Curated annotation (Swiss-Prot):
Chemical reaction(s) catalysed: uridine(747) in 23S rRNA + S-adenosyl-L-methionine = 5-methyluridine(747) in 23S rRNA + S-adenosyl-L-homocysteine + H(+)
Binding site for S-adenosyl-L-methionine: Q213, F242, E263, N308
Name of the featured protein: 23S rRNA (uracil(747)-C(5))-methyltransferase RlmC
Binding site residues for [4Fe-4S] cluster: C3, C11, C14, C88
Originating gene: rlmC
Gene Ontology biological process terms, A to Z: rRNA base methylation
Known role: Catalyzes the formation of 5-methyl-uridine at position 747 (m5U747) in 23S rRNA.
GO molecular function ontology, one term from the record: iron ion binding
Family, as annotated: Belongs to the class I-like SAM-binding methyltransferase superfamily. RNA M5U methyltransferase family. RlmC subfamily.
E.C. code: 2.1.1.189
Length: 376
């Protein structure tokens, strides 16, 4: 794939952009097999590949420059000058067109980007999410205060007329002078408050603050793989810890008698419940609880426990708790293989029966890994 930003060295986030994709896959595969050296080579399944371009459904743009010449993108690592990334080839063509329009719309609307040195201005970030199923967008303006809302509201009709696919628009208030992406307060500027996405026939509800996978093509295969593994095992009861908006639980519910999804973020749980209602699933229960606290409060484990923790992993305490609960099966999905490997050391009673990785972020070193662990 050719990327002008990478060739000009203005953005080097995709560190392996110049490496042929087949070679990227081979390098990652070898690195993961080396990291998990205790896993039998025969346990590894073929990796799930990504499209090399137009594969991301989310864009997180820093608002830079001045009101008369705003830029959506990043700061140059050389001299700090603003670099526009609105035409990043990882985004869909529709997303690129909308981002380019927004960059000009911000200028004509007179919305000043926030200057972190002078601590002046309003617009900090523009966050864009696209539903591949419906082609609709959720657009969030992260601003320092409510001072910019009047200008945003006044100019919204022009934006919506130009891009009617923008279904959800909100302003997130982030007043703190820190490199924090978003604040607590979300002000909706449209009647619609969420997007509808669909993977493998399963509806998914996407709200502003809920975590959602960035690569829909690969995410769909991740969920389908977990569903297929669970379908083979046919557990009586299954827990989905760190369930987010319910992607794994919703896919696996038809193949278990009872599924319980646990997630600390209430907004994500509300999304998961709405998806379950749309599917008409009655053997699935979601609760807004801390996954570690829920697990530690149980005296008897489910037949199968699926975990999908954040980058920090499960940690020693929760890993040891799962070891003591002695569930027959664990499915561990991880966005950080290093912490996953550390957690597996605290699960000595389990053998890795199946391992597969998913190239969620092509052209980088990152990989999503999922393993089926069986109690020995």
């Amino acid at each position: 794939m050719s990327c002008p930003y990478f060739e000009q060295k203005s953005c080097t986030s995709c560190t392996h952009m110049n490496t042929p994709y087949s070679q990227q896959l081979e390098t990652k595969d070898n690195a993961l097999r080396s990291l998990f050296s205790d896993v039998e080579q025969s346990a590894w399944l073929a990796p799930v590949q990504s499209d090399s371009m137009h594969c991301r459904n989310k864009a997180k743009m820093v608002a830079l420059g001045a009101a008369h010449q705003p830029t959506l993108g990043i700061e140059s690592v050389q001299d700090g000058t603003p670099i526009s990334l609105v035409h990043c080839p990882l985004y869909t063509q529709e997303s690129q067109e909308l981002l380019a329009y927004l960059q000009e719309w911000i200028r004509t609307s007179g919305i000043p980007p926030y200057n972190k040195v002078k601590k002046k201005g309003e617009l900090k970030f523009v966050l864009l999410t696209r539903s591949q199923a419906r082609g609709e967008f959720m657009l969030r303006f992260v601003v320092r205060s409510e001072a910019a809302l009047e200008r945003i509201r006044h100019n919204l009709p022009r934006l919506q007329q130009a891009f009617p696919a923008v279904r959800v628009i909100s302003a997130n208030i982030q007043p703190i002078h820190m490199a924090r992406l978003e604040g607590e307060q979300e002000i909706f500027l449209t009647d619609a408050h969420y997007l509808l996405e669909e993977f493998n026939g399963v509806p998914m509800v996407v709200r502003p603050k809920s975590f959602f996978q960035t690569n829909p093509h690969v995410a769909a295969q991740l969920y389908a793989t977990a569903r297929n593994w669970v379908a083979e095992l046919k557990p009586r009861q299954m827990w989905d810890l760190f369930c987010g908006v319910g992607g794994f639980a919703l896919h696996c519910a038809p193949h278990a008698e009872q599924v319980i999804g646990i997630e600390i973020e209430e907004e994500a749980i509300n999304s998961a419940k709405l998806s379950a209602q749309q599917l008409g699933i009655d053997n699935l229960r979601f609760s807004a609880l801390d996954s570690a606290a829920y697990s530690q409060a149980q005296t008897q484990a489910a037949d199968l426990i699926l975990v999908n923790p954040p980058r920090r992993g499960l940690g020693q305490a929760l890993s040891e708790q799962l070891e003591q609960l002695a569930s027959q099966y664990l499915i561990y999905s991880s966005c950080n293989p290093v912490t996953m490997q550390q957690d597996l050391a605290h699960l000595p009673s389990y053998r890795v029966e199946r391992a597969q990785w998913f190239d969620m972020f092509p052209h980088t070193d990152h990989a999503e890994v999922m393993m089926l662990l069986v109690r020995q």
